[in-house]
Amino acid sequence: MSTETESLTGSKGSPTGPPQMKKNALSYASNIVIGVASTAPAYSLAATVGFFVLIVGVGVHSPAIIIVSFIPLFFIATAYKAMNEVDPDCGTTFSWVSRAMSPSLGLLIGWTVILSDIVVNANQAQIAGSYGFQLFGLDNAASNTLDVVILGVIFIVGLTWICWRGIELSALTQQFLLGFEMTLLVIFSVVALIKAYSGSNPASMHVTLSWFNPFQMSFTALLDGVLLGVFLYWGWDTGVSVNEESENSNDGPGKSAVVSTFVLIGIYLLVTVASQAYAGTKYLAANPDDIFAGGLSKGVLGPLHFLLTISVLTSATAATQTTILPAARQALSMGRRGAIPRRFAEIHPTNLIPARATIWAGVLSVIWFIAISIISSDVLADCVAGLGFLVCIYYGFTGFACTIFYRYEIFKSVKNFVTLALMPTLGGLALMGVLGYGLYFYGQSDNDSSAPFLGLGVPDWIAILGVGGGIILVIIRRFQAPEFFREPRQKYGDTIETVTREDEFAPADSML
């Protein structure tokens, strides 16, 4: 039996026992790259901006929606930074909520993190499959569900293999994919703005400050927009989930989360403003599923318009890979603490990655993707809306956990109060408000793409699966591993011991 002693004041001992993930494998820049890539900027913009415009009362104010959506998520990013400074655990939200609030709640919230990763992988695989065929002019295959599923599964399997090979290969892949994606988005935006002001498109509009003013919308329109905005920003926390493999693990990953949110708001505003200025709101509203697929990309980039297709493809590909990373590490942390079977904490002796957890993250993603695709593509779209509910839950509770964990520190200075209590709590409350409104909104049958089941829409069922499934998991594990649930609540300054039994680990090469 090995014992890891960890002081929750920002320092960490040197644990012995089973293999650990590779230390200092990722730089601060790699943390930012992984965090930004996980949000799939090109795909998120292509599939979201048009829907902003479609919301009654939003129109030209899409940039204002992006700004307002940024605020609560920036607040939560500061909570990630504060918690990572004292507990750089790859389980992030699971670890922090279980220690600050309760082990039962930590396991429930940790389950929603894993479920959100699995749910979104299906959508990203569908995009990768469809765009992969479009890139080569195979439009019939791109619209054929079976063909798209087969190619999407190949993408998931290939990206799971890259994650399996090691974190450094994963980071290198991300740098290439994100570099190409961001370069194309910037070039597209600059050219679009130049053409908008040159008058080459009669529908072009000049940018005005009113576009950025949220007070020119109704509160209902603003809430509807923020429901989408949460999905737009989700994913930057992946850069924190690889903290144990990062340089300066206490500080770098947390700072990267905050920086990632600013990178995202910058590129989102640039592309949204440029697209709206060049094409106008009528075009964006007419092409909500993919604003780049119509005449926008051809009008801006001419014969090079196919590069935007590649950009969206690389975006979905990068996001699929970076979604496998946090799911596996969340399971690793849970297994290490005994919240789920300890075999999920296996570390591959050569690749130094979560062995069983990585494979199961890929397997469950494939199973979910195939199952949802068989039901309906509309269900797949509604699952993305439900994903926003899961994100609100686990981001929100991360904010609450931060305030509770630092409860005896928050009144020691104004800075502490603002960064450790006010911002995390406001961020959490805002996301709980969005969650409540979203449950009401998607509870109305008119707001679902697919038919309701037992009176509820698919997004609501995703939320029920998240909370209900988590409760069932907690009940089962209370009987199977009661020692985890006896762990006391922690606060800043406490020292804990995490006990790991080597005899509970099977060899990493015998995972299946």
Show the residue positions of the predicted features.
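C-terminal membrane-solvent junction of multi-pass transporters and transport-like membrane proteins
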Residues: 29, 344-351, 395-444, 453-458
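Helix-loop-helix connectors at the membrane interface of multi-pass transporters/channels
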Residues: 95-99, 125-150, 179, 184-185, ...
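TM-loop-TM module centered on a large, flexible mid-protein loop between adjacent transmembrane helices
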Residues: 95-97, 102, 134-139, 212, ...
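Helix-loop-helix junctions that connect adjacent transmembrane segments
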Residues: 17, 24, 59-66, 137-147, ...
